[in-house]
UniProtKB/Swiss-Prot annotation:
Gene3D superfamilies registered for this protein in UniProt: Protein tyrosine phosphatase superfamily (3.90.190.10)
Annotated organism of origin: Saccharomyces cerevisiae (strain ATCC 204508 / S288c)
pH dependence: Optimum pH is 6.9.
Reactions that this protein is recorded to catalyse: O-phospho-L-tyrosyl-[protein] + H2O = L-tyrosyl-[protein] + phosphate
Protein name per the record: Tyrosine-protein phosphatase CDC14
CDD domains linked: CDC14_C, CDC14_N
Locations listed in the record: Nucleus, Nucleolus; Cytoplasm; Bud neck
Domain Tyrosine-protein phosphatase: 190-342
Record-listed E.C. numbers: 3.1.3.48
SMART domains xref list: DSPc, PTPc_motif
Length: 551
């Protein structure tokens, strides 16, 4: 087990192995200690009075140097002291960089890396913004550490896939001055066109090198939306020509956006993210206004605090979120987090944001959802109505022989015949197959009843074969009007006990024939159509017979 090393102005991170120091002199290595610093190799490029924190590229370079020292066989049993000068700014940068290293590389938790820094005297200096006004808002090492840790937990930072060469190349102005903040967002300074004639160029061949670099990178990295927050310094057609949608959400430099702009931005960004694309956002410098909107989305999506969000953004792109925008983000951080649960992405696109979908309240979302359901129901009903109109059958022309009677008794017409009327068959039947005597099959024509035949020319054959079913065939086969027959009770009784002779139909058989034709029409074709009374067959089943009881 390694033993502790006690040195003045030194903080122990890992017992006997990793220490943080601050000295006004250059310490010399011993048999037990190895000292190193990066102040002469890694520099923070300040905008004004800002001095840190160091960015992710600085951390990557620091990690490479640190690992070389730790893995040197000569240092296997020595404690390694990472130190800085005694300057308050340098102490803060060194401590913050070592803490972020332990979070990202060694997978320490925030409380593990912050515990050694607690109660340090003098305390570490907080970081300020890149603006020119007095620093009235500060973030601490703790804010940066928690911001980096949360980004790591949410999959926004991965040093294993980090490309140092690309990062350092594109952060330079001559290559576009942009940084990939997260897998979904790119922050960049506004491209500018050289237009000495007073108009914006429309051909990309006349663009300067930074603009061309931006266009090439965006086209090759699935950027689907560019959001402009400043006044026009280029023609948006350059982005649209390569298939990138362009959106203007302009507000004044150095000011804070209205919440309606934020909702439009968050909704538009969510729309693009769900499509699998990236969003590139810029203002004049790509720092203040850009940081406001991207920061609001990070808080909305991942639950950052305002300070954590600012710390993380500056860790990726130094200088982001300036002046009063820091206070604005702090004051509205709870609003942005609540939006995750109190708002929804609109179901209707907004022309104000180029046909994308803004963020709306739950109440408005419910109304939209209800209206869409109602509209869908109405449209479905209209379609069904149109289909019914197309497939509706014409009304009956009254000539069908198989139409049902208005009553159980035949009505007496002026011509003295019995007329049967029904709407059971909506259109004229083409004729039904019938079984005839001696196994012969015929087609009964039941359509032509315009010229009814006389009673003398009609012949109704009712036959009882060996089967239990009876068949009836109209040998003349056309008219559904029968002559009026006077009948008595005894006649009906006699007709029910004997077969009909001389082809003279009785009223009972006429009624049975009409019932039989109606049953034949209404019953499914695969059923056996029978008529007459019910009786028990030899097998014990019930059968209908025509006119008489089968013995």
């Amino acid at each position: 087990m390694r033993r502790s090393v006690y040195l003045d102005n030194t903080i122990e991170f890992l017992r006997g192995r990793v220490y943080l120091g601050a000295y006004d002199y250059t310490p010399e290595d011993t048999d037990e200690l190895v000292f190193f610093t990066v102040e002469d190799a890694i520099f923070y490029n300040s905008f004004h009075l800002d001095f840190g924190p160091m960015n992710i590229g600085h951390l990557y370079r620091f990690a490479v140097i640190f690992h070389e020292i730790l893995n040197d066989p000569e240092n296997a049993n020595k404690a390694v002291v990472f130190y800085s000068s005694a300057s308050t700014r340098q102490r803060a940068n060194a401590a913050c960089m070592l803490c972020c290293y332990m979070i990202l590389v060694q997978a320490w938790t925030p409380h593990q890396v912050l515990q050694p820094l607690a109660q340090v005297d003098p305390p570490f200096m907080p970081f300020r913004d890149a603006g020119y006004s007095n620093a009235d808002f500060e973030i601490t090492i703790q804010d940066v550490v928690y911001g980096v840790w949360r980004a790591k937990e949410k999959g926004l930072i991965d040093l294993h896939s980090f490309n140092l060469e690309s990062y350092e190349k594109y952060e330079h102005v001559e290559f576009g001055d942009f940084n990939v903040l997260t897998p979904d967002f790119i922050a960049f300074a506004s491209p500018q066109e050289d237009h000495p004639k007073g108009y914006l160029a429309t051909k990309s061949s006349h663009l300067n090198q930074p603009f061309k670099s931006v266009l090439n990178f965006f086209a090759n990295n699935n950027v689907q939306l560019v959001v402009r927050l400043n006044s026009h310094l280029y023609n948006k057609k350059h982005f649209e020509d390569i298939g990138i949608q362009h959106l203007d959400l302009i507000f004044e430099d150095g000011t804070c956006p209205d919440l309606s702009i934020v909702k439009n931005f968050v909704g538009a960004a969510e729309t693009i993210i769900k499509r699998g694309g990236k969003i590139a956002v810029h203002c004049k410098a790509g720092l203040g206004r850009t940081g406001c909107l991207i920061g609001a989305h990070l808080i909305y999506t991942y639950g950052f605090t305002a300070n954590e969000c600012i710390g993380f953004l500056r860790f990726i792109r130094p200088g982001m979120v300036v002046g009063p925008q820091q206070h604005w983000l702090y004051l509205h951080q709870n609003d942005f987090r609540e939006w995750k649960y109190t708002t929804r992405i609109s179901l209707k696109p907004s022309e104000a944001i180029g046909g994308l979908y803004p963020l709306i309240s739950l109440e408005e979302y419910r109304l939209q959802k209800k209206k869409l359901k109602d509209d869908k129901r109405v449209a479905q009903n209209n379609i069904e109505g149109e289909l019914r109109d197309l497939t509706m059958t014409p009304p009956s022309n009254g000539h069908g022989a198989l139409s049902a009677r208005n009553s159980s008794q035949p009505s007496t017409a002026n011509n003295g015949s019995n007329s049967f009327k029904s709407s059971a068959v909506p259109q004229t039947s083409p004729g039904q197959p019938r079984k005839g005597q001696n196994g012969s099959n015929t087609i009964e024509d039941i359509n032509n009843n315009r010229n009814p035949t006389s009673h003398a020319n009609r012949k109704v054959v009712i036959e009882s074969n060996n089967s239990d079913d009876e068949s009836m065939q109209d040998t003349n086969g056309t008219s559904n009007h029968y002559p009026k027959v006077s009948r008595k009770k005894n006649d009906i009784s006699s007709a029910s006990s004997s077969r009909m002779e001389d082809n003279e139909p009785s009223a009972t058989n006429i009624n049975n024939a009409a019932d039989d034709t109606i049953l034949r029409q209404l019953l499914p074709k695969n059923r056996r159509v029978t008529s007459g009374r019910r009786t028990t067959s030899a097998a014990g089943g019930i059968r209908k017979i025509s006119g008489s009881i089968k013995k």
